[in-house]
Amino acid sequence: MGKLFGTDGIRGFANIYPMTVEVALKTGRAVARFAKEHGGTVVIIGRDTRRSGDMLEAALAAGISSMGINVLEAGVIPTPGVAFLTATVKGAGAGVVISASHNPFHDNGIKVFKSGGLKLTDPEEAKIESYIFDAGPDRADSSICEPKTSDSAIEPGTISTISNASAQYANFLTSCYQRDLDKNTPDQPLKIVVDCSNGASFKVAPMVFPTLGFETQFIFDTPDGKNINHNCGSQHTETLAKRVISTGADLGLAFDGDADRLIAIDEQGVKLTGDKILAICANHAKAQGRLTNNLVITTVMSNIGLSKALERLGIDHIKTGVGDREVLKEMWATGAVMGGEDSGHMIFSEFHSTGDGILSALCLIRVMVDTNKSLSDLATIMTVYPQVLMNVEVDPSRPDFMKIETIAREIKRVEQALNSSGRVLVRYSGTQPLLRVMVEGPDLEATKSHCQSICDAIKQASI
């Protein structure tokens, strides 16, 4: 069997392997076994708005129940909402999210949180995967539901609904914003436009922003099972930017399908990605004495402008591999309370154990409220360097390209040309036979030329 778990759980086209009801059923049994081994009696399930979510939820719940573990269904709720419930519901040994994040509606995925609302480690993920394909006496396949005698049958767990799951999560979010709130609340409430991406935030977001006194307009908040992420959300902010300008709003907020990432729009319609939001929030936390160890965790894909901004602000930073799980791992190791990716995944561990789009939005808004500054003013903290990314198809065997003299020489030439004013990152794709070439520099045309020259060297080497 091929490996099921990718960089963020199991993912694929719904109703095609591995995103089938058969795999979902076996995954439910495997997760139940994992939860039971860690003293859990309950597994939480949440999902986004994709049409296939109901189907996969039913299979997962059946698998979990068949192993004698109770199921609590949270319904449509953001991924970080499942993490929150997994950390707070008594007896919860795991939480399962059915979502494919920012992907089109025809895709879906399954990702797992362990008790405490934490993402699985690589060994824990491997253990669950081994349970899915286990051939032992407790294997997670259909035979476990076919006991030879009634004495050997497992008593099924119950399957029930958490009727107020969204409200519980919304109350948690509002409490995070209101913590230590002082007299700086503006006389006029901020005017906000929120793009729910027709996804998992469409129920929770209206319970949060108006409750906190913001004049809020919601767009793309009418999911139909097929319109999630369609020309909306964190990857398609054009409509949001136009609405912010036309309504005179102070800012716009765009979430992805499962609302674990945030992209912001300032009052002039300019987009702020994760790097710039992280710089704004880190600087404010430092000023308030809340930036533990004076440290922020970023990734190798973070813009060089973020590194330069943090250095200028006197804030230390460590770069990790790509993925919010890598960021969180380094945060735990170093005691950092803030980290994230330019894609909009940001972790504020002072409040939550995972990336959370709505929480990130509230942290950004708190900076605006506390400083009484516009978002465009705050955004001047960081200059985003032009970044060019190109892909080159290569052999699936993934040879060590730095051992090929012509490629190594060209990369070194570009690095020397950029000096400290830019950088080069060449890495293999995690899912496709591609070499990704990323070059950053102060001049866009020169950066394009540098990136193309490296790609040409790779193509000529025929790797």
Swiss-Prot record:
Coiled-coil intervals, chain numbering: none
Molecular function GO terms recorded: magnesium ion binding; phosphoglucosamine mutase activity; phosphomannomutase activity
Xref: Gene3D superfamilies: Alpha-D-Glucose-1,6-Bisphosphate, subunit A, domain 3 (3.40.120.10), Alpha-D-phosphohexomutase, C-terminal domain (3.30.310.50)
Catalytic activity: alpha-D-glucosamine 1-phosphate = D-glucosamine 6-phosphate
GO biological process, one term: carbohydrate metabolic process
UniProt binding sites for Mg(2+): S101, D256, D258, D260
Cited SUPFAM superfamilies: Phosphoglucomutase, C-terminal domain, Phosphoglucomutase, first 3 domains
Protein's UniProt name: Phosphoglucosamine mutase
EC number assigned by the record: 5.4.2.10
UniProt enzyme class: isomerase
Organism from which the protein derives: Desulforapulum autotrophicum (strain ATCC 43914 / DSM 3382 / VKM B-1955 / HRM2) (Desulfobacterium autotrophicum)
